[in-house]
A protein has these predicted regions:
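Vicinal oxygen chelate
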Residues: 1-13, 36-85, 92-120, 132-154
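Conserved beta-strand-loop-alpha-helix junction that forms the acyl-donor binding cleft
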Residues: 16-22
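Short, solvent-exposed loop/helix junctions and linker helices
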Residues: 19, 84-87
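Conserved active-site tyrosine of GNAT-family acetyltransferases
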Residues: 25-30, 97, 121-124
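Short glycine-/small-residue motifs
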Residues: 128-129
């Protein structure tokens, strides 16, 4: 497996999804969203932008999560968590991903501080795709929140 550089603050956020068909989901995250496979099999690790998507066939419980069963969303219209992808140009991404087969719920819609739209992956996981439109907003990495509590106590 290729190695991503270690995160500067010692942490990186990875999104873990459960799929009924790991290969189908791999194709979606690589061919439609443009990620690249870093580890094949089950799970599949896909590098996407500056993070990882881990695609797993589900299962459980396991010794470290003895009461947890991993499964796909039973109802894709009832969501408690979703992936949020921030982009520089939402209209360009919408056109590109639509051409690659992404099925958006709606075209991008303007909201007070962002323009956004949503897609679902093949298992029904919701994905927000958005662009900040706040003229005062700076979403560059220099303005991301710190990932360590130690800095707050200094």
């Amino acid at each position: 497996m290729a190695e991503l550089p270690p995160p500067p603050d010692g942490i990186v956020l990875t999104h873990f999804i459960v799929s009924d068909d790991v290969e189908r989901s791999r194709r979606f995250y690589t061919e439609v969203l443009g990620g690249r496979v870093e580890r094949a099999g089950d799970p599949v690790n896909v590098a996407l932008a500056n993070s990882w998507i881990v695609i797993n066939g589900g299962g459980g419980p396991t010794d470290d999560k003895p009461t947890v069963i991993l499964e796909t969303p039973p109802d894709p219209d009832r969501v408690s968590s979703f992936l949020n992808i921030r982009v520089k140009d939402i209209d360009a991404v919408y056109a590109e991903w639509s051409a690659r087969g992404a099925e958006f719920l709606t075209p991008p819609k303007q909201h007070p501080y962002e323009k956004r739209c949503y897609i679902r992956d093949p298992d029904g996981h919701l994905i927000e795709v958005g662009q900040t439109t706040d003229p005062q907003g700076d979403w560059s990495p220099d303005h991301w929140p710190s990932s360590t509590a130690a800095e707050e106590s200094e």
